[in-house]
Amino acid sequence: MKADAILAELLSDSARANPYPLYHALHELGPIAPLAEGLAGATPFRAVATGYDVVDQVLRDVTFYKKGLPGRQEHTLLTTFETSMMFTNPPDHTRMRNLFSKTFTPRRLAAIDPIIESVVGSLLDQLEERGAGGATVDFVEVFAAPLPALVMAAFVGIPVEDLPWYQARVRPIDAFLDLNGKQPDVLERADHAAQELRDFYADLIDRRRRDPQQDLLSALIRKIDAGEHQLTDAELISNMIVLFNASFLTTIYLLGSGLPLLLSRPDVTAALPGNEELALDCVHEILRFESPVQFLTRAAPDDVELAGVPVPKDGVVLLLIGAANRDPARFGDPDTFEPGREKLTSLGFGAGPHYCVGAAVSRAEGRIALPRLFERFPELALAGEPVGIGSLFLRGMQSVPVTLG
């Protein structure tokens, strides 16, 4: 089967539930395969990369760039994306990234541990209350989703009472990000949500300027207003929207996808209580095995060859992160979930200049949450089939029914 046909199959419902057989089929074509036709309704990809080394090479190469989205001037969502560091190229990306990198200090990141511990303790209490008497409880609803939302709210400076409203506006934006999401009605809903979030942050920035707090947003504003970094309020708003969304979703899908995997390994769950080092191994292996972000794209700066495959100047390469993290040339027995496997870095947080700026927060959430979860509920068990979110771009669970034992 040619790469074009395999890629077209990835859009089917069955592939969204389990894309890995198709990833294996692409691996058999080599680390990168040319595409003749691209995908109707999406960016016309010129090649698809599944080999770890090729994907890693392109992500680290600063000359490969993010191609602008058509119609971005007419849509609030696309303008938001393209004025954030996640979607820009140097020098704008470098300018924005430097501000966040210098604000995410070791001291600030260390201060997040007590926040996570407090939130985890509260959510474990709620989990116990909802699961009393052997009742089935949705792990995603009660634990995995609230955890990063509450932590990020405290870290960033979003009032906790605004979180339900905020999260409702994140969903239409995520729907647009999928390969099948580029439809006019989906974009219209995402535009509306993006504008509401922009208005929300504009008001919050104004309040933080008048009354600074000990949160990330106040620290960013101080550095900008002191002239240490050049960022407009519009760019700050775009980056806050994208940063919160990315950090929030990564942890939800890390925990939601990870729980069924961990429950398949009772030897691991029995060893997790009190063992944050093992918890970090689990975090890294979950991110490899079920990457929350399944693909990224980059455009070639010139006519180039990648592993012998020609890519023309400005041609877009589809980088299948989920496939690269299952590359048998990189990972031994890649379809086996094995925390503590050889210390090889996955691409779960990306690589290169666009490496996830919130990775340390997500790792800390997993490191703290997993040992405490299985210490509190050693008999935790699945109570039904987990339900996936049904996206190709993002991979995770929307529901994981459990009993507490």
Per-segment meaning from a language model:
Residues 1-405:
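Cytochrome P450
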